[in-house]
């Protein structure tokens, strides 16, 4: 069934470009930029990819991102991901990038953006993959820092379709960023936000009511709140679910416990995505395949999940 799933036309709506940094590319960029790494080789780094929670993953993720320095580095990162998409018949992507991860270490905003945009444009021309780029604020930093990032983004407003919110969830509720999201909407941006991954269902309510998001990224803990489930179903609010990420970060102990197919059958507009595939062991097709292997997902369910991803695009 893997080949059939691979050939299914699909969109990816929850993908962090920095999370596609495969160990081989990470080492190549470190060499290009003369950066000493704490790992001796690719295999040693792969062994470090054992996380018990979101924070342990984020610590490694931010350390890895340090090799990204030049416009060419960001181009190469994005282009490598788009080639994976082409191989898996992902026809539309709406990736996140985290400018603060780079500007906080002295990389100019415009350098980061130029490399990513050039690769996305080439992906559309050469690979036929359409896109919409999402600028994501880091929630472990202050709202003031997010406002500064929005200031940096405004001269390039035509580069983005939306703003988002990611990084350490617990202790950083969506309400912390209500003003910057209000401002982003007034500037013409759509909004999305990570909520209900490690954080409680209340964070999903806040993302909907205070940040006024078009989509919820993750959202799996909505299953704990029946009133919230009814709202998601009634309003057909998409959830960008990331099964392999959820098991790798111990949101679910095992894929057999995942609720995505239960939510699908209840009528929630769930989609399948890879989140940070270099770190979590699989791109979109591998996430579909894991659901088939562990939960017995049928072809009909896979078709619905793929169609949901196409329907839930911000860029039609």
Swiss-Prot record:
Positions annotated to bind Zn(2+): 14, 16, 194, 275
Site (Important for catalytic activity): 218
Any one of the GO BP annotations: adenine catabolic process
The keyword Glycosyltransferase is assigned to this record: no
GO molecular function, one term: adenine deaminase activity
Residues binding substrate: 276
UniProt KW keywords: Hydrolase, Metal-binding, Nucleotide metabolism, Zinc
Top enzyme class: hydrolase
Record-stated family: Belongs to the metallo-dependent hydrolases superfamily. Adenosine and AMP deaminases family. Adenine deaminase type 2 subfamily.
Protein name (record): Adenine deaminase
Source organism: Pseudomonas paraeruginosa (strain DSM 24068 / PA7) (Pseudomonas aeruginosa (strain PA7))
Source lineage: Bacteria, Pseudomonadati, Pseudomonadota, Gammaproteobacteria, Pseudomonadales
């Amino acid at each position: 069934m893997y080949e059939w799933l691979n050939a299914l036309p699909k969109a990816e709506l929850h993908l962090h470009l920095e999370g596609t940094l495969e160990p081989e590319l990470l080492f190549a960029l470190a060499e290009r930029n003369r950066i000493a790494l704490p790992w001796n080789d690719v295999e040693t780094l792969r062994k470090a990819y054992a996380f018990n929670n979101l924070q342990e993953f984020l610590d490694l993720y931010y350390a890895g991102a340090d090799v990204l320095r030049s416009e060419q580095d960001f181009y190469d990162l994005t282009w490598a991901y788009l080639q994976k998409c082409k191989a898996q018949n992902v026809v539309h992507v709406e990736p996140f990038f985290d400018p603060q991860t780079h500007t906080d270490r002295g990389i100019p905003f415009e350098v980061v953006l130029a490399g990513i945009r050039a690769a996305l444009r080439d992906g559309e021309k050469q690979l036929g993959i359409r896109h919409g780029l999402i600028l994501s604020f880091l929630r472990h930093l202050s709202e003031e820092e997010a406002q500064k990032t929005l200031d940096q983004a405004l001269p390039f407003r035509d580069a983005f379709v939306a703003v988002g919110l990611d990084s350490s969830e617990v202790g950083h509720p969506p309400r912390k960023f209500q003003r910057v999201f209000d401002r982003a909407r007034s500037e013409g941006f759509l909004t999305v936000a990570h909520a209900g991954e490690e954080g409680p269902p209340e964070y999903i309510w806040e993302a909907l009511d205070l940040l006024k998001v078009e989509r919820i990224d993750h959202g799996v803990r909505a299953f704990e709140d029946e009133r919230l489930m009814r709202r998601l179903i009634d309003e057909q609010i998409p959830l960008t679910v990331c099964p392999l990420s959820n098991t790798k970060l111990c949101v679910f102990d095992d894929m057999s416990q995942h609720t995505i197919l239960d939510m699908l059958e209840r009528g929630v507009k769930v989609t399948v995505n890879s989140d940070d595939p270099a770190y979590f062991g699989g791109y979109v097709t591998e996430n579909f395949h894991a659901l088939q292997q562990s939960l017995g997902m049928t072809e009909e369910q896979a078709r619905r999940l793929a169609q949901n991803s196409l329907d839930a695009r911000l860029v039609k």
